[in-house]
């Protein structure tokens, strides 16, 4: 299991959308390798996920055509290709409590939607088979360490990439988190289940 970050956009946010459509699976990995997703804590139709329907099927072809070969699990899709794929664009309407899953090869991005339209809060989730060869003992040790430290990771449970302690604030230090002021949740009754997932 990964310990993905969260996404929070307040209702008053007036940021404008940009094209940053991407695939979260490396060009040199063409098969279904990972389902990623989120649990939505708010209902959203404006500030939501945008997917490009069935693009997981052209993942290999797309990166070959663009002559892109790498092992990075985050690759931007060319802006002109995104515009040309407009008929495949699906802006998801997501009710509160929904679990949304997609193949990591799928071209996708979040959008802000109409200014000052709605609050958005989601918790990202991702699971991969525990018995995979890339899920080494070292990865398990790291996952336990980061779980105890309450750190978040990338979408991929392995190889594990830990995120910074502070959220992306784009220079606004007033949005930094003072972790000493937070109340720790008591999750003792869930620990055996958590240990099994880790």
Task: Show the residue positions of the predicted features.
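Double-stranded beta-helix
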Residues: 34, 44-109
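Short, solvent-exposed aromatic-acidic interface loops
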Residues: 8, 54-57, 143-150
């Amino acid at each position: 299991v990964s310990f993905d970050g969260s996404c929070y956009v307040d209702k008053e946010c007036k940021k404008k959308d940009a094209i940053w459509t991407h695939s979260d699976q490396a060009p040199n990995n063409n098969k279904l390798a990972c389902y990623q997703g989120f649990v939505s804590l708010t209902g959203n139709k404006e500030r939501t996920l945008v997917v490009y329907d069935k693009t997981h099927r052209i993942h290999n072809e797309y990166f070959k055509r663009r002559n892109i070969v790498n092992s990075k699990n985050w690759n931007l899709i060319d802006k002109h290709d995104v515009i040309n794929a407009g008929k495949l664009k699906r802006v998801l309407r997501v009710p509160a409590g929904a679990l949304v899953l997609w193949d990591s090869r799928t071209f996708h991005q979040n959008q802000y939607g109409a200014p000052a339209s709605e609050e958005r809060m989601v918790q990202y989730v991702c699971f991969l088979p525990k018995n995979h060869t890339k899920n080494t003992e070292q990865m398990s040790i790291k996952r336990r360490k980061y779980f105890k430290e309450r750190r978040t990771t990338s979408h991929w449970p392995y190889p594990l990439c830990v995120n910074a302690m502070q959220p992306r604030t784009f220079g606004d230090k007033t949005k930094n988190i003072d972790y000493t002021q937070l109340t720790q949740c008591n999750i003792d009754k869930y620990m055996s289940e958590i240990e099994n997932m880790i």
